[in-house]
């Protein structure tokens, strides 16, 4: 599937083909080129320039192997961006086209264009903006505010409005089912070398399914989440260094608030790499956790329940555990999901995520105590 996707990708299109695709959209000015842009892993992204050489639009080919329901995907994004735009207008904000992504309809008023093989969409380019890759406490505080504000603006979207673009994406019970299937089938004959890790996962399984149980008991509600809360999914103003808007909205869908803070802690507060072979490098950076949480609570306290606030640090452990389970599942299955760069890559990733989980567990009391300020 992945090879098929690569063969089909946007980079294989000629300039004429790309300009013809762009011509299907309601653009407001003439464009002359579309060049590869950014370093996203999922979709193909191109920057589109006008005759003066200014970047005006962003053209994306949607990866329909991952987002199989493109109608739902674009409908979700349309609902979310319109909702945010309305909130910004009500607040009397200026410069709104830089504070929310603006997707352009096709000439027949569709949210995407299908060329017979691929699905395409176009949004306005946000001028004088930049994103960061590294994570500092200062940026984490800004990120917390940005994602808290994002959730806050979307808190009044009624449950049931948005679809799940990747079903069961952060559903721990589902991820454990996949894991148990992998163990049962032992497709790649690797069980013997990962027995200890399997035991560690089983030991924690029940405690890691709290959110699904609380939801069934009516004690936790589903909210609109971003589900990919990385520091590079925010655009900053190049002059003021303040966050303009949150981008990469493909995974915006109903879920639990623990997911968004949890994934930021997992990716941003790790002192090592996600696939660090030297486990001594991998620990939780508590300053990053505190900075993100402080920024997040400034914006999100107004709509969170005491139960949600109390569980936020648990979100970090949950998402790290979930990723450990997913990497190990893929290793046991024979590396069928994640791209690998060496035969043991998924095992190295599993061990690195598990080390981060152990570090988060060691700091659990300190992280829980930090939340008492808001309870």
Q: Where does each model-flagged region fall?
A:
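Short, Lys/Arg-enriched N-terminal segments with co-localized hydrophobic residues
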Residues: 1-10
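Juxta-kinase regulatory segment immediately upstream of eukaryotic protein kinase catalytic domains
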Residues: 11-33
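Conserved ATP-binding subdomain of kinase catalytic cores across diverse folds
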Residues: 34-37, 41-177, 257, 273-277, ...
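Activation of the activation-loop gatekeeper triad in protein kinase-fold domains
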Residues: 247-252
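Active-site activation/catalytic loop segments of kinase-like enzymes and analogous catalytic loops
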Residues: 254, 258-302, 318-337
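All-alpha amphipathic helical-bundle segments outside canonical DNA-binding/catalytic cores
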Residues: 304-316
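Long, compositionally biased intrinsically disordered regions
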Residues: 360-363
């Amino acid at each position: 599937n992945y090879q098929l996707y690569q063969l089909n990708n946007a980079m294989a299109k000629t300039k004429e083909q790309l300009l013809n695709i762009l011509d299907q959209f309601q653009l407001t000015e003439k464009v002359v080129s579309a060049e590869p842009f950014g370093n996203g892993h999922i979709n193909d992204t191109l920057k589109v320039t006008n005759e003066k050489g200014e970047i005006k639009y962003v053209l994306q080919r949607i990866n329909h192997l991952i987002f199989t329901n493109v109608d739902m995907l674009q409908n979700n994004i349309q609902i979310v961006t319109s909702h945010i735009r309305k909130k910004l207008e009500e607040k009397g904000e200026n410069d709104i086209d830089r504070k929310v992504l603006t997707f352009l309809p096709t000439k027949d008023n569709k949210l995407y264009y299908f060329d017979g093989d691929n699905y395409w969409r176009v949004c306005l380019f946000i001028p004088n903006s930049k994103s960061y890759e590294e994570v500092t406490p200062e940026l984490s505080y800004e990120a917390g505010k940005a994602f808290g504000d994002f959730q806050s603006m979307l808190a009044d979207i009624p449950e049931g409005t948005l679809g799940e673009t990747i079903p069961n994406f952060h559903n721990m019970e589902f991820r454990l089912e996949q894991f148990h299937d992998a163990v049962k089938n032992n497709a790649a004959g690797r069980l013997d070398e990962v027995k200890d890790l399997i035991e560690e996962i089983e030991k924690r399984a029940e405690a890691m399914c709290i959110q699904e149980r609380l939801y069934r008991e009516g004690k936790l509600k589903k909210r609109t989440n971003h589900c990919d809360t990385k520091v590079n999914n925010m655009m900053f103003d190049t002059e003021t260094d303040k966050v303009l808007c949150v981008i990469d909205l493909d995974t915006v869908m109903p879920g639990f608030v623990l997911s968004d803070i949890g994934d930021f802690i997992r990716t941003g507060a790790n002192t090592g790499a996600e696939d660090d072979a030297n486990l001594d490098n991998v620990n939780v950076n508590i300053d990053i956790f505190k900075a993100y949480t402080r920024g997040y609570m400034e914006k999100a306290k107004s709509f969170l329940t005491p139960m949600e606030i109390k569980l936020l640090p648990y979100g970090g452990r949950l998402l790290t555990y979930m990723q450990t389970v997913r990497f190990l599942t893929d290793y046991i299955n024979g590396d069928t999901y994640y791209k690998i760069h060496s035969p043991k890559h998924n095992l190295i990733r599993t061990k690195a995520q598990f080390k981060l989980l152990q570090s988060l567990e060691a700091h659990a009391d300190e992280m829980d105590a930090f939340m008492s300020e808001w309870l």
